[in-house]
Each structure stands twice: as C-alpha cells, then as structure tokens.
Amino acid sequence: MGALEVLVSDILCEAGLKKLDVRTRTALELPGYFRATKKWDLIVISNGALVLAMEFKSQAGKSIGNNVNNRSEEAVGSAKDIWTAFREGRFGQFPPPFLGYLFLLEDRDNVKTPVANKEPYFKVDPEFGGEAQEKGKRGSQHKGVSYSKRYELLCRRLVLERLYTSACFLMATNSARTKITQPAPDLTFQRFVAALQGHVVTFLGSRGE
C-alpha cells in the first residue's frame, strides 16, 4: 500500500498542493466525536484547513472471511466519527473535507467463490444474496456472493450513503509480475483520482491560489 500512498501524494502535489501539506507518515491524528482521535493514512492540512483525509486498506491471505465484517464496521465507523466531529466544529469554519477510501484485495480463487449467508431468522439484503438456486422445501435458496463482491458493494455503498466522497476498489495478484484489475467501472482508480483532483482544484480556487 505504500506505493499507492506515494502515488496519490504525487497526484495531489501535481494538482497544486504543497508537498509539506500532504502527510503520510507522521502527525496523522485527527479529532473524532465518539473517540478522542483517529490516525488516518493520508491527510492534507493547508493553512489550518482540513482539505482531505484518506484510508488505504488491504486484505490478503486465506483467512479473508474473518475480516470482512471488521473492515466494513471500521470503514462506516470512521466516516461517521469524523463527519460528526466536523459537524461539531472540530475542524474550524471551513468547507467539508474530501473523505476517500481505497481498498486493495488480493486476487485469488477463494475471494471469487460465492459464500453462503447464515439467515436463521431474516433474509439478507438481495445484493448479498447472489444468484437463486433451485427451490427447496424452504423456498428459493441463494448462493450468496463472493468476498470480492462484498467489498465492491461496501465501497459503492460508502459513497452512495455519502459516508465517503469517493471510493476505489482494486484487486491485485500476489506474484512477481503483479496484475491489477478493477472489477467495478464506478470504483476505478481513474474515477477516484478525478474526484480527488476536482476537490483540490475547488479548494485552491476558493483560496485564490
């Protein structure tokens, strides 16, 4: 993920931000509402204004199923926390910051296989249900969707519900010649960068820079 952070930092500087305002290593703590502070992965502070805050998350290995819900809860909670802190004036009288979420998932067979949902009482959201199987004694059964699809839905809904300004979902093989794919056309790195650049241009324009 370090390479992606460097790439995004370079893009921000090319868009007109000062290099010293873009932070990726130290002093990344921002105030919250439900907790005192949270350490973000990349933030931009310019002339006292919070321009943007970003999360870079990744998932690799065989035990991916144990972490999907944790990642989802973390993403939603962090966004709710910082937006409430913004509402309460923790970041001064400035326009809303850009909140970005980038997720990189290891591309392997077990993340592309449908995973059944446990539904002892109620049916899950149809988007997580997947394709319908043959009808059984309890009616239509569904295969469920893969872990990669679950992460795709997470990223899409984080933006749909306005928890994050923009999100990006990437998959990459763990090999000598890494192959990167972008499963969802609405969650590509190009679209993410375009939204990021647009926010920076608007911010600098409001400052007359």
What are these regions (language model features)?
Residues 36, 43-53:
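Active-site beta-strand-loop-beta-strand hairpin of nuclease catalytic cores
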Residues 65-177, 181-182:
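Acidic, metal/cofactor-coordinating or nucleic-acid-engaging core segments within structured domains
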Residues 1-8:
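A short, highly charged nucleic-acid-interacting micro-segment common to nuclease
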Residues 10-35:
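A short acidic/basic microdomain associated with nuclease active sites
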Residues 49-61, 100:
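Glycine-rich, often proline-containing surface loops adjacent to acidic residues and nearby aromatics
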Residues 9, 13, 19-20, 173-209:
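Low-complexity intrinsically disordered segments
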Residues 29, 57-70:
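Short helix/strand-bridging catalytic loops that position acidic/His residues to coordinate divalent metals
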